[in-house]
């Protein structure tokens, strides 16, 4: 995993798992709203009344409806080893 992905993937994954509503602003100013259904290296699937595939290169900002807590790197591993 590259350094650029080390924050992005856990952040998007937390938004997806917790089904947090998000507003996604595109570089052209358009605002999209919905929940993150899935994502990969290049796209995000945003679900509202329909699913939209949004290319990451077109995204300016992702704004969650509430605060998101993402696990610090290695935090989940410590919990598993302490069990």
From Swiss-Prot:
UniProt entry tagged with the keyword RNA-binding: yes
Similarity comment text for this entry: Belongs to the Hfq family.
HAMAP family linked to this entry: Hfq
Function recorded in the entry: RNA chaperone that binds small regulatory RNA (sRNAs) and mRNAs to facilitate mRNA translational regulation in response to envelope stress, environmental stress and changes in metabolite concentrations. Also binds with high specificity to tRNAs.
Protein name: RNA-binding protein Hfq
Sm domain mapped to chain residues: 9-68
Keywords, alphabetical: RNA-binding, Stress response
Any one GO biological process: regulation of translation, ncRNA-mediated
Annotated organism of origin: Hahella chejuensis (strain KCTC 2396)
The encoding gene: hfq
SUPFAM superfamilies given in the database record: Sm-like ribonucleoproteins
Subunit structure: Homohexamer.
The UniProt record lists the keyword Cell wall biogenesis/degradation: no
GO cellular component, one term: cytosol
Single annotated GO MF: RNA binding
Coiled coil: none
Matching CDD domains: Hfq
């Amino acid at each position: 995993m590259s350094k650029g992905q080390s924050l992005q993937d856990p952040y998007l994954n937390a938004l997806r798992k917790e089904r947090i509503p998000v507003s996604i602003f595109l570089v052209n100013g358009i605002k999209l709203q919905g929940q993150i259904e899935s994502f990969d290296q290049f796209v995000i699937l945003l679900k509202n009344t329909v699913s939209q595939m949004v290319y990451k290169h077109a995204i300016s900002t992702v704004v969650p409806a509430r605060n998101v807590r993402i696990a610090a790197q290695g935090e989940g591993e410590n919990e598993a080893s302490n069990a």
